C-alpha cells in the first residue's frame, strides 16, 4: 500500500430542503388553512480520527466529498428528513488547512476526535410558518440554503514516541525490525526506506511507538534525497534516536550533517532530546569503538550508545522508555498549581 501523506479534496455540505406551500384539504373543513412543512437540513461532511487508517490514500480516489441533501417539506406540516452526515475516517495526526501552506483549521490528534469540515445548509420554511392574524392563507415559502463546494488540504504527521533518524544505510530499518518485528525492507544500499514506517515495542506493559524515516543527506532541507519530505513525521516525536554507521571514517562529520539538516528544517526539531547510537560496531575494532564514542560524546555532549548486530536491544529500549517516563513526569509538574492542591490554603490579601 502506498504511503500517501498529503491530499487535496473538495468538500460540500448537503443543501437544505425547500419549504412547502400546502393547504389543508379535508371533508367538511372549508378553510383548512396552510399546512406546508419545513425542509430538512443538509448533512455535514465530518472528518474523524481513527486508528484503523494509516494513510490518506482514500482521498486519491475520492476527491469530491458531498453530504446528502435535506428533503423538502410536505403537507400536513410534515418536515423533510435531514440529510445524512458524511463521516470520513482519517489517520490520527491529520491536519487540515484552508490552502497549501495556509492556516491550520483542524488538528485531529486523538482517536475519535471529529471536525465538521463542511456544514449542511438550513432547510427552508413552509407556508404554515407564515400564517398570521392578517394573512390567513400565505403562499410564501423559502428555499433551502445551497452550499458551495470548496477545497481543503490535508497533511498527515504520524504520531510516535521516538523518531529514528540518520544518514542512508545507517541501519535504521534493521533496528526498527529488530525492536518491533516490523516488516520493513532491509538491504545493503542507500535509500532502502522510501517512506516512513512505524513499529511498536512492548516495554513494561507500555507500547513504545518508533518511526523510521528515509535517510537524510546534505541539502535535504532544500529537497535533496528523500528524507526532507518526511521530516514532518518526526516533529511530534518526544525523542530522537540518531543512528550513525560505526564504520564511517568521519564520525563527527556524519553527525553534524544530519543535525544541520534538522536545524535548517525546524528549530524545534533540532532542539528535541536525542540519543546517539553508534551502530554496526561489529564492523570495527574495540579501539575504534572507544575512540569514536568519545569523539561523539565530546562534540555533542549527549548520551552515546554503542550497538552491534548481536547485542540485545532490551537495555536500549528500557533506557528510552525511562527517558519518556521522565519527560511525562516533568510535563505534569509544570502543570501543577500549588494553589489548587488539596490541603493548601492560599493566604488572603490583608485589607488596608
Swiss-Prot record:
Q: Does the keyword Oxidoreductase apply?
A: no
Give binding positions for GTP.
166-173, 191-195, 212-215, 279-282, 308-310
Q: What is its main location?
A: cytoplasm
Q: Name one GO biological process term.
A: ribosome biogenesis
Q: Which terms does the record give in the GO molecular function aspect?
A: GTP binding; GTPase activity; magnesium ion binding
- Where's the Obg domain? 1-159
Give the disulfide map: none
Write out the entry's keywords from A to Z: Cytoplasm, GTP-binding, Hydrolase, Magnesium, Metal-binding, Nucleotide-binding
Please name the Gene3D superfamilies in this protein's record. Answer: GTP1/OBG domain, P-loop containing nucleotide triphosphate hydrolases
Q: Name one Pfam family in it.
A: MMR_HSR1
Q: Which cofactor does it need?
A: Mg(2+)
Q: Does the keyword Nucleotide-binding apply?
A: yes
Give a GO cellular-component term.
Answer: cytoplasm
OBG-type G domain boundaries? 160-327
Instruction: Kindly give the InterPro entries that the UniProt entry links to this protein.
Output: G_OBG, GTP-bd, GTP-bd_Obg/CgtA, GTP1-OBG_CS, GTP1_OBG_dom, GTP1_OBG_dom_sf, OBG_GTPase, P-loop_NTPase
Source domain of life:
Bacteria
Main EC class of this protein?
A: hydrolase
**Could you say which EC number(s) this protein's record lists?**
3.6.5.-
Q: Name the residues that bind Mg(2+).
A: 173, 193
Q: Where in the cell is it found?
A: Cytoplasm
The record describes its quaternary structure and partners as: Monomer.
Give a short account of what the protein does. An essential GTPase which binds GTP, GDP and possibly (p)ppGpp with moderate affinity, with high nucleotide exchange rates and a fairly low GTP hydrolysis rate. Plays a role in control of the cell cycle, stress response, ribosome biogenesis and in those bacteria that undergo differentiation, in morphogenesis control.
PANTHER family reported for this sequence: DEVELOPMENTALLY REGULATED GTP-BINDING PROTEIN-RELATED, MITOCHONDRIAL RIBOSOME-ASSOCIATED GTPASE 2
Q: So what family is this one in?
A: Belongs to the TRAFAC class OBG-HflX-like GTPase superfamily. OBG GTPase family.
Q: By what name is this protein known?
A: GTPase Obg
Q: Please give the organism.
A: Anaplasma phagocytophilum (strain HZ)
